[in-house]
Amino acid sequence: ETGDNLMKEDWKPGTMIYPLPAVLVSCGSTPEEYNILTVAWTGTICTNPPMCYISVRPERHSYDIIKRNMEFVINLTTKDMARATDWCGVRSGKNYNKFEEMKLTPGKSTVVSAPLIEESPLCIECRVKEIVALGSHDMFIADVVNVRADTSHLNTETGKLELAESNLLVYVHGGYYGLGEKIGKFGWSVEKKK
């Protein structure tokens, strides 16, 4: 329905900001400790200095690993990684080696000791600055200390990263989705017509 007939109803307060990136967070300082955690409660919180966050339940296996090492890697996921992304969110690293089970490759990060995931098109190395207890989740506020990009997604002419072609995965209210078509670019609504 449109116009005056458009109906809305009140719902109880809840977490309804969607879509969100569905990322794999890798952590651990030694191969024996390496683990992967699926996270949708993540995002950018500052441009300069570059900072981001992940929110994790204290009972999750990765929580103690991240708290102990104070670093992690946010690995963006793709359509090809969808099964691994879901699986790593419903299985515990206490019982499984998630890298082996999902045939993901732990790679060497440049700055942090936590591994990156080689299959990810973009890996964001993070160092925890502050942990904020919020309720069901604690927020790990982190400085971005390095970004590693898969060169296959670099435009050789412009040098720009073209992540849209990598079939990024997003999370919407319990479901995983690919990105749709491009609608515009930042600032297009105010550009002067040539």
Model region roles, listed by residue range:
Residues 2-194:
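Basic, polyanion-binding surface patches
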